[in-house]
Amino acid sequence: MKRREFVQTASFAAVGLLSLPSFLAAGKGQKGLGLQLYTLRDTIGKDPKGVLQKVASFGYKELETYSYNNGQIFGLEFAEFCKYVKGLGMNVTSGHYGLNMIKGDTWQKAVDDAKKNGQEFMVVPYINEPERKSIDDYKKICADLNKAGEVCNKSGIRFGYHNHAFEFDKLDDQIPFDVMLKELEHKNVGMEMDIFWVVNAGYDPLKYFAQYPGRFEQWHIKDMDKEDKNRNANVGTGAIDFKPIFAAAKKSGMKRWYVEQETYPGQPIDSAEACAKYLKTIL
């Protein structure tokens, strides 16, 4: 995972809301703290059940996974993993899937597995550099994402795309992220905004919520080190003020959010705990 810049004015008409899949329009609310398990990538593959026990003890209730592959995750059957998560009082509500997975039978199987285990969102989190050399490259990817979203819609799952920084580096005097917002059909693809990377690029998430209301259905929450903007801080100790951001959740369209740390001031598991403690004080 990596990231960077954008801005543009757009309106989100009421007719657009009416065209959304009913499962999204209904909008089940988040039931507790969320965590993207990539935060614990150094340990979860070695001891998934032990790590999940600690995560549950911190008060997390909703999890976003990564690394699913052909019915397996972290060395376990995906169904077994989800059952264990539920036994700890948590749920897998979202997952990250590689761009190379969204075509063909592998995608349908992933969607079927997600559906069977009660997952609500499936997200593509990254575009490899060789695949994004031009605006035309982005447009082609958006076409693929729209098709993947159609498959998800048929199973009652919401499909999304997660931003990094590179989408905001201009190509041909255009900002790729703006292009994506135009090319992606909202009925098929929602956005998972990584708050950190928007701020890292020098932009204000609140402005994007105002310019594209209803488009940012999931968030990643991580704070920015006050001395080095490319490093994470435990949420609540860095440069980002999350109170006004959460206050704008309805305008943004947010349904789910997840703490995600890519770098740490200490041990990853300690960061997961510290972030949970802070977020409990403001939510």
Sequence positions of predicted segments:
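Active-site acidic/histidine proton-transfer and metal-coordination neighborhood
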Residues: A10-S11, L17, P21, E62, ...
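Active-site mouth loops of central-metabolism enzymes
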Residues: G34-K46, H96-K103, I135
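Histidine-acidic metal/acid-base catalytic patches
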Residues: R4-G16, S22-G34, L40-F58, D172-M193, ...
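Mature catalytic domains of secreted/periplasmic carbohydrate-active enzymes
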Residues: E62-E64, G75-L76, C82-Y84, S94, ...
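Active-site beta-loop-alpha junctions enriched in small/polar residues
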Residues: Y38-L40, Y66-N70, Y97-N100, I127-E129, ...
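Accessory recognition modules or surfaces
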Residues: G29-G34, L40-R41, L63, I73-K86, ...
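Acidic (Asp/Glu)-rich catalytic clusters
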Residues: L52-S57, I73-V92, Q108-Q119, A143-K154, ...
